[in-house]
């Protein structure tokens, strides 16, 4: 769709989105009526349960109210869980878990037993177990197990914890692979609908299935479009769930005109800042990227959020970078009060139109997937992966041509920065296994290289060669003309890690040549 240069009041004419109210179906303006509160989540990869517990208790005192534990399946047992969750007040903090997909039911049983042993009020327990059959196909090419069988067993096992969600729609994987906003949303809706369709056909009530689904979206740097994306997501998902006519499974005041459960139509949304646009060089610029992304998600009304530490591209985040990531969200809450105002974008000529445009394009994609047999069939055929990989290719081309700007990488790079020991970090399985790309593949996978990867490879290769070619700017003539050309040339060559020697200007060409020879330049650029 096309975005106009500006919008006016008449652009709102005919838009039904302006009639929506906060906390009311179809939840365009959010699922909450009183505030815009969201949970600050931090991830913990559990190598030692005792150390992970100590870290969790520490960060809970520093503003975190949602924890995400990545646990190793081979170490799972009651004692392990007891150590991991020791002294954590589960009624006061959201607990989220991911492990090997073949052990999620075991994890659910252990969690239920632990909470029952501690005699917690189950109505106060909030959290999730990350079961995502389809994400494993997307990222690792593995079609393992039976989604319906595992899904049914998992929902049954977690039944004593009514507010725990166990079916994950990890659209973050699409975002990190370079998917455009409408692609991410359209495929996420088809992903969620696949759970709804298959599990309701297996005999599970629609309301129960819907209340067990959690969406995990990525956040790109398209500030206003991301705000609109979250608004459109809730609108579309509410209508998808409503089409299943979910019946209330408990007493509820939030019923539709035909008695359907409208609570089931609420989309549970976790958002995480994207890694696609993060960079290895000039890495502190990542803080600017993730800050604007966090603002988009907060204004878009997400339920919880993870801000990716700025150094994740080249090392395991340390205490410093994790503290900065936490504080980025806390600043939005405590200093900017983003958690106090519900959907401040409502009525905006621009954002209301963006919401409708994104919703329409995502809905068209959703329908095309459904017409082709659904999300599962599309994954097996490879059409989802092919479309997203094509977007990845197009965005890499845009970055190469500087139509998509990565500050510090393809535009205004730091001339003197060296990578040193920095090396791109390769992804690992969430259950603590090996590298993702080493696994044998049953289906085509997503290409999840970052937008900056090709520029970084060029700079790293230059640095590894042991000699940085010197590029000498021989500037002469009109001041404005020569500066413009010198600046362009400096940026262009510095993107490859070349040593750039800029100059104020020479009176004659001979003087410039003499200076270039004295500098032992490998390249001379006449500006």
What is the predicted function of each stretch?
Residues 1, 130-134, 170-176, 211-220, ...:
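A glycine-rich phosphate-binding loop feature that marks nucleotide/adenosyl-phosphate handling sites
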Residues 63, 119, 237, 300, ...:
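Conserved, mostly hydrophobic/aromatic
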Residues 179-185, 220-232, 274-287, 315-325, ...:
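Short glycine/threonine-rich loop-to-helix capping motif typified by GTGT followed
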Residues 226, 230-236, 240, 271, ...:
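Extended, hydrophobic alpha-helical segments in both membrane/secreted and soluble proteins
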């Amino acid at each position: 769709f096309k975005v106009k240069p500006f919008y006016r009041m008449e652009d709102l004419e005919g838009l039904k989105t302006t009639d929506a109210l906060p906390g009311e179906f179809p939840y365009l303006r959010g699922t909450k009526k009183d505030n815009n509160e969201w949970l600050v989540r931090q991830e913990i990869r559990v190598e030692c349960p005792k150390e992970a517990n100590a870290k969790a208790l520490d960060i809970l005192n520093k503003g975190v109210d949602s924890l995400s534990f990545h646990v190793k399946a081979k170490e799972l047992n009651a004692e392990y869980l007891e150590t991991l969750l020791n002294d954590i007040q589960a009624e006061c903090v959201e607990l989220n878990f991911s492990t090997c997909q073949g052990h999620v039911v075991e994890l659910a049983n252990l969690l239920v037993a632990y909470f029952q042993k501690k005699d917690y009020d189950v109505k106060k327990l909030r959290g999730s177990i990350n079961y995502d059959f389809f994400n494993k196909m997307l990222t690792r090419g593995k079609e393992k197990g039976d989604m319906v069988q595992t899904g049914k067993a998992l929902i049954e096992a977690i039944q004593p914890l009514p507010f725990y969600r166990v079916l994950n729609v990890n659209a973050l994987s699409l975002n990190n692979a370079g998917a455009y906003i409408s692609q991410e949303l359209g495929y996420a809706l088809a992903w969620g609908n696949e759970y709804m369709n298959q599990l309701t056909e297996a005999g599970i009530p629609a309301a129960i299935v819907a209340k067990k689904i959690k969406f995990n979206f990525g956040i790109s740097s398209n500030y206003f479009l991301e705000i609109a994306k979250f608004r459109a997501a809730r609108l579309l998902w509410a209508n998808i769930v409503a089409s299943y006519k979910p019946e209330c499974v408990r007493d509820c005041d939030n019923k539709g005109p035909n008695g359907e459960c409208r609570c089931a139509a609420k989309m549970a949304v976790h958002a995480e800042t994207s890694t696609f646009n993060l960079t290895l060089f000039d890495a502190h610029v990542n803080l600017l990227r993730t800050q604007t992304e966090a603002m988009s998600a907060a204004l878009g009304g997400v339920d919880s959020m993870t801000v990716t530490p700025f150094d994740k591209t080249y090392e395991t985040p340390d205490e410093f970078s994790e503290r900065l990531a936490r504080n980025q969200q806390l600043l939005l809450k405590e200093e900017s009060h983003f958690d106090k105002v519900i959907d401040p974008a409502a009525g905006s000529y621009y954002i209301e139109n963006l919401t409708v445009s994104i919703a329409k394009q995502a809905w068209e994609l959703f329908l095309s997937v459904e017409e082709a047999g659904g999300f599962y069939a599309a994954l097996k055929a490879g059409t989802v992966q092919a479309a997203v990989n094509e977007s990845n290719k197009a965005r890499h081309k845009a970055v190469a041509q500087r139509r998509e700007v990565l500050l510090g990488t393809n535009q205004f790079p730091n001339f003197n920065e060296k990578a040193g020991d920095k090396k791109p970090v390769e992804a690992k399985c969430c259950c603590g296994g090996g590298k993702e790309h080493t696994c044998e593949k049953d289906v085509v996978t997503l290409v999840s290289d970052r937008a900056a990867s090709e520029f970084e490879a060029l700079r790293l290769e230059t640095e590894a060669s042991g000699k940085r070619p010197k590029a000498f700017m021989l500037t002469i003539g009109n001041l404005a003309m020569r500066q413009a050309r010198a600046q362009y040339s400096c940026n262009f060559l510095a993107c490859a890690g070349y040593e750039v020697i800029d100059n104020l200007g020479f009176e004659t060409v001979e003087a410039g040549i003499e200076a270039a020879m004295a500098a032992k330049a490998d390249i001379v650029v006449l500006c």
